[in-house]
A protein has these predicted regions:
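Anion-binding alpha/beta catalytic cores of soluble intermediary-metabolism enzymes, centered on
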Residues: 1-198, 204-252
Length: 252
């Protein structure tokens, strides 16, 4: 059986990425799970392996950001050419990446543009959690200031993200009828409009359209309960309206 080929970008050469990559690939279980290709500055992927370079935190941010972005570009090119089957990205310094000429808020936006894919969803998946069950979270909006979220969040966006999520759950997890939860924007799903109208104005129309399209979606469900309900098996994935509400639950 041909092993899965994985490109690993080393991230910011001044940071923890190369060191973490070296430690991970030294683990026999990880190293035996796939065929890994390190992608980064030549000094870091030379004959002595990851960590052989002499980059330090004192090195300039533009230079470090430039090579970190170039590693992602190279990995995407390899994936599109069929040379690798997947990409793993080590941490980057977003400010350095910007200083290096890569004008993206983060990895998801960069990967989407380099791959030429207009419709994408950022899906975080953990097959085991502290509560036992799996948790899959999609961020409807990603790297935005919180004050910009209400303007960016639309019914069209929620329909797109939930539909992409359902398609992915069928294709990658073989779940025939995925159950999607739409997380509320406001505390207690706004308690009938007492504080905020996003649930009635944005989430409710999205739910109607999803039902018409055959997507099994429920909501709006308050953030303080929806993730626990998902881990306990009630939902296969949660659509979070903004970055931190989804990532805080996922990383906990």
């Amino acid at each position: 059986m041909t092993p899965v080929r994985v490109a690993v970008t080393l991230g910011d050469p001044r940071g923890i990425g190369p060191e973490v990559t070296e430690a991970a690939l030294a683990d026999r279980e990880i190293a035996g799970a796939a065929s890994f290709v390190r992608v980064g500055p030549d000094a870091l992927v030379g004959p002595d392996g990851v960590g052989a370079g002499r980059w330090t935190p004192a090195d300039g941010a533009p230079a470090a950001g430039r090579v970190a972005g170039e590693a992602v570009r190279r990995a995407v090119a390899m994936a599109l050419a069929g040379e690798v089957d997947a990409i793993v990205t080590a941490p980057i310094d977003k400010a350095a990446v910007h200083a290096g000429g890569w004008n993206y808020p983060g990895h998801p936006e960069m990967l989407a543009e380099l791959a030429g894919v207009p419709r994408v969803a950022m899906l975080m998946a953990a097959e085991r959690t502290a509560l036992g069950g799996p948790l899959r979270v999609v961020l409807a909006t990603t790297h935005l200031a919180l004050r910009d979220v209400p303007a960016a969040l639309t019914a069209d966006l929620l329909v797109e993200q939930a539909t992409l999520t359902a398609d992915s759950l069928r294709a990658l997890w073989a779940i025939p009828r995925p159950r999607i939860a739409l997380c509320a924007v406001n505390p207690h799903a706004s308690d009938g409009g007492l504080f905020g109208d996003e649930e009635a104005r944005i989430v409710a129309p999205a739910l109607r359209r999803l039902a018409e399209g055959g997507v099994d979606a429920a909501g709006p469900i308050p953030a303080d309960t929806v993730f626990t309900r998902a881990v306990r098996g009630e939902f296969d994935a949660v659509i979070a309206p903004y970055h931190d509400v989804g990532m805080a639950a996922f990383k906990t």
